[in-house]
Amino acid sequence: MKIATIKTGLASLAMLPGLVMAAPAVADKADNAFMMICTALVLFMTIPGIALFYGGLIRGKNVLSMLTQVTVTFALVCILWVVYGYSLAFGEGNNFFGNINWLMLKNIELTAVMGSIYQYIHVAFQGSFACITVGLIVGALAERIRFSAVLIFVVVWLTLSYIPIAHMVWGGGLLASHGALDFAGGTVVHINAAIAGLVGAYLIGKRVGFGKEAFKPHNLPMVFTGTAILYIGWFGFNAGSAGTANEIAALAFVNTVVATAAAILGWIFGEWALRGKPSLLGACSGAIAGLVGVTPACGYIGVGGALIIGVVAGLAGLWGVTMLKRLLRVDDPCDVFGVHGVCGIVGCIMTGIFAASSLGGVGFAEGVTMGHQLLVQLESIAITIVWSGVVAFIGYKLADLTVGLRVPEEQEREGLDVNSHGENAYNA
């Protein structure tokens, strides 16, 4: 799809969904309803979407620990977001942080609007993104991290990594000023979370028996259910990042459908060739790979670009969870880096290509060439990787020094459900 009327679009769209529009401050009821629905969909991605997806991927003796970690970190992020997160991410400030004018949402009038939606809805929508990002990380730490360590890490990482990167990309900070394109969270959400997960997986070490015992998903129907919820919720994630129910939201919606379908096929046929059989897990993983890959691009590219990004993301994700994972020698139980990191990087780079009007996209900002845009995209990826990696290292080390990162070996063997939470998912 080609939208020829948006020549100035990318200069401003690069700051979506954190953009404060310059249009008259008039709330539109339809846009507000649309954004509230999108916010609810993104919240639904975390609870229960990502919890069920990850819960099914791990062993049955640890499934409740995963559901608990996702649920409690979700609650923690919600509180931190309204206390200071939103203000530091989207308040006016410097290249890295906003200000403190909106602490506890102070100074935000009930009737304050951003573009055509009430600012309170913007607070909730952006908070839902912070929640899902933190939820993604815990999959890399599954089956051996101490519950209290997760909470300490989340406070540090949300404050010093998620918030500044969100400000840099969507809040008018450094990367926004450079013209980085990230429509719905390729850098802010997926690469950011994947790097934090990878660092954590290295620091916490491999699970007891890793490489010697067969660690298989204990409940594939649960994985499928989680995938379906994530898929539906992702339409709120991507289309909602337009900030209004307009033609860009429609474009993002269609591109999400196309890229997901293409990635499922890409992953499945790749797996079929590699292993001799297509699997349900492969189809679910392919869907997530396509959704991740199209996230930074969905509002900038045409349908042809979405198709290509989907296929490439599907194959790249398959490579990420097989060959790259073996190369890295890391125990990432839910393949957070292999899917979200690899496909997030692929999507961000390809956004700089397929946003070109000659390739069906909405076109670059005036005077910007594809080569320049690709350099900016690479810059945004590099900054996100380094920033998130350093902050994650600090966060994990702080948690380790205070409460210890990992549960004792005997507790790990017995399972975190019983030892950390005093419950069993499957009682005889």
From Swiss-Prot:
Changing residue 340 to E/F: Loss of transport activity with methylammonium as substrate. Shows normal GlnK-AmtB complex formation after ammonium shock. GO terms for molecular function: ammonium channel activity; identical protein binding. Changing residue 190 to T: Loss of transport activity with methylammonium as substrate. Cannot form GlnK-AmtB complex after ammonium shock. The record marks 182 as: Important for the deprotonation of the ammonium cation. Keywords: Ammonia transport, Cell inner membrane, Cell membrane, Membrane, Signal, Transmembrane, Transmembrane helix, Transport. The record marks 237 as: Important for optimum substrate conductance. Its main location: membrane. In the presence of high extracellular ammonium concentrations, transport activity is inhibited by interaction with the regulatory protein GlnK. Ammonium transport through AmtB is required for GlnK sequestration. Formation of the GlnK-AmtB complex is influenced by intracellular pools of the effector molecules ATP, ADP, Mg(2+) and 2-oxoglutarate. The rapid drop in the 2-oxoglutarate pool upon ammonium influx and a simultaneous, but transient, change in the ATP/ADP ratio promotes AmtB-GlnK complex formation. One of its GO terms (cellular component) is plasma membrane. Changing residue 190 to A: Does not prevent transport of ammonia. Loss of transport activity with methylammonium and methylamine. Shows normal GlnK-AmtB complex formation after ammonium shock. Loss of both methylamine and ammonia transport. Residues 23-32, 91-119, 172-185, 242-248, 301-302, 356-370 are periplasmic. It comes from the Bacteria. It is found in: Cell inner membrane. Specifically binds 1-palmitoyl-2-oleoyl phosphatidylglycerol (POPG), which increases protein stability. POPG is an essential cofactor for transport activity and, in the absence of POPG, AmtB cannot complete the full translocation cycle. Can also bind phosphatidylethanolamine and cardiolipin-like molecules, leading to positive allosteric modulation. PANTHER family: AMMONIUM TRANSPORTER MEP2. Involved in the uptake of ammonium/ammonia (NH(4)(+)/NH(3)). Transport is electrogenic. Following sequestration of NH(4)(+) at the periplasmic face, NH(4)(+) is deprotonated and neutral NH(3) is transported into the cytoplasm. Neutral NH(3) and charged H(+) are carried separately across the membrane on a unique two-lane pathway, before recombining to NH(4)(+) inside the cell. In vitro can also transport the larger analogs methylamine and methylammonium. Also acts as a sensor of the extracellular ammonium concentration. Belongs to the ammonia transporter channel (TC 1.A.11.2) family. Homotrimer. In response to elevation of the extracellular ammonium concentration, interacts and forms a complex with GlnK. Interacts with GlnK with a stoichiometry of AmtB(3):GlnK(3). Sequestration of GlnK is reversible. This is Ammonium transporter AmtB. The gene is amtB.
